């Protein structure tokens, strides 16, 4: 191709090529953006699915435990409802050209996802703390049970010792009675001897 023709192509075709490349780049970027947005929404959907049962259990506990659980339940409910609402709005705009609005929705969803993850981690921390506290309580209870058993053993030992003392006392009483009987027999014999001497 002659140099002059190349120059014409460069001069006239340059803007067209640039425009074509720009459109191609925009298409690629839009595809990437939609893929990324869809990935965020799918990930958030999985997070919502995993947290919803936890939210329901906390709701049941809030009826028993009171304010702390009720506040967590309300916070999770609000976040899940906000996420659902924004996802619905995003899907309505998915194929439109409202790029800025879609971008804002995605940013809100990312923020909600982070907040949901944070709350879930706090719940896990509280659960772990509760488990450790329950284990500590169980250890104390087991210690108390062992101490009570030791006290019962000591009491049983004391009872056996008291019974042994009572047996010894009973033996002593029987021996004293036997001695008294012997003494009484001796006294009667002495009286009989004195009476015989007196009669003679």
UniProtKB/Swiss-Prot annotation:
Q: Where are the transmembrane segments?
A: 7-29
- Biological process terms in GO annotation: plant-type hypersensitive response; response to bacterium; response to ethylene; response to external biotic stimulus; response to fungus; response to jasmonic acid; response to salicylic acid; response to symbiotic bacterium
In which broad location class does this protein mainly occur, judging by the first location in its UniProt entry?
membrane
Q: What induces it?
A: Expressed in leaves after powdery mildew infection (e.g. Erysiphe cichoracearum UCSC1). Accumulates upon oviposition by pierid butterflies (e.g. Pieris brassicae). Induced in seedlings by the beneficial symbiotic fungus Trichoderma atroviride and, by the plant growth-promoting rhizobacterium (PGPR) Pseudomonas fluorescens after a transient repression. Expressed after infection by the bacterial pathogenic Pseudomonas syringae pv. tomato DC3000. Triggered by various phytohormones such as ethylene (ET), salicylic acid (SA) and methyl jasmonate (MeJA).
**Where is this gene product found?**
Membrane
Which residues are in coiled coils?
A: 70-127
Is Transmembrane set as a keyword in this record? yes
Q: Where is the RPW8 domain?
A: 1-157
> Entry's InterPro entries?
Powdery_mildew-R_dom
Record membrane topology: Single-pass membrane protein
UniProt keywords (A-Z) are:
Coiled coil, Hypersensitive response, Membrane, Plant defense, Transmembrane, Transmembrane helix
Which GO cellular component terms are attached? membrane
Kindly give the Pfam families that the UniProt entry links to this protein: RPW8
Miscellaneous comment in the UniProt entry for this protein: Ecotypes susceptible to Erysiphe cichoracearum, such as cv. Columbia, are lacking RPW8.1 and RPW8.2 but contain in place HR4.
Q: Give a short account of what the protein does.
A: Probable disease resistance (R) protein.
Family label: Belongs to the plant RPW8 protein family.
Q: What is this protein called?
A: RPW8-like protein 4
Which gene codes for it?
A: HR4
């Amino acid at each position: 191709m002659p140099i002059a023709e190349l120059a014409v192509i460069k001069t006239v075709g340059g803007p067209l090529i640039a425009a074509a490349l720009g459109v191609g780049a925009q298409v690629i970027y839009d595809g990437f953006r939609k893929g990324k947005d869809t990935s965020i929404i799918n990930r958030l959907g999985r997070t919502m699915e995993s947290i919803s049962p936890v939210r329901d259990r906390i709701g049941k506990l809030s009826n028993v435990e009171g304010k702390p659980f009720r506040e967590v339940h309300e916070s999770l409910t609000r976040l899940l409802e906000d996420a659902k609402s924004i996802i619905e709005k995003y899907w309505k705009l998915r194929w439109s050209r409202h790029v800025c609005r879609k971008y804002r929705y995605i940013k809100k969803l990312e923020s909600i996802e982070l907040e949901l993850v944070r709350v879930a981690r706090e719940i896990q921390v509280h659960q772990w703390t509760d488990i450790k506290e329950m284990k500590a309580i169980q250890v104390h209870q087991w210690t108390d049970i062992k101490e009570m058993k030791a006290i019962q053993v000591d009491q049983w030992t004391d009872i056996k010792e008291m019974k042994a003392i009572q047996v010894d006392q009973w033996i002593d009483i029987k021996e004293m009675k036997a001695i008294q009987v012997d003494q009484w027999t001796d006294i009667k014999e002495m009286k009989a001897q004195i009476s015989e001497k007196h009669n003679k």
